[in-house]
Amino acid sequence: ERANHLETLYIPFVDIEGEQSGAVEDDTEKPQITAYEVWKRGRAAGLVDTDTARAAFFTQNFADDYTLQLAPELYVKVDAASCRVKETEKIGVGGLTEQIVAVTVTGEGEILSGTVSASEKEQLLNTRMEDYLNAIAAHALEKEIDITNSYRNLGADNRTWYFKYQNTPAAYEKDIKIQYLVKINWKSE
């Protein structure tokens, strides 16, 4: 446990789902991952949905590929992705300094279903993916969960932030904002 005390861990929550096929009830039950228990600083921090956990795995480069729904009929898959996390500051509203955890996503992508015009494919898909990931990250931060797991690397990545937050990791999760920049090369059909 001590080795993971700075990590944000996602533990699968498995539930047994009954299945029905046609008019006859099938008595087979199938285990399914329905959520993930978040474990941080040695304590349970609550449940998150599977989309949030998958986004965290992807952001931390633990997923070989990532399939997601960007619109009602638009499914995409990203392969060979790399997510680079960098802590930075910018002047925000009212001249206040905002602490930004910027995530740059690169890789190859393809449309699994749905259509997008060739002229707007690259920009539209990247923007939709940014919006999707930014929404998930913002929702997780409302629960004080950093899906980038960036706190664990502050000592090496940003010494100023490290000294500021070394004894107050909960304040770090309240103060940061996560922003994604997606630069996926989308394959042509």
What name fits each language-model region?
Residues E1-E189:
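Membrane-proximal alpha-helical signals and transmembrane carboxylates
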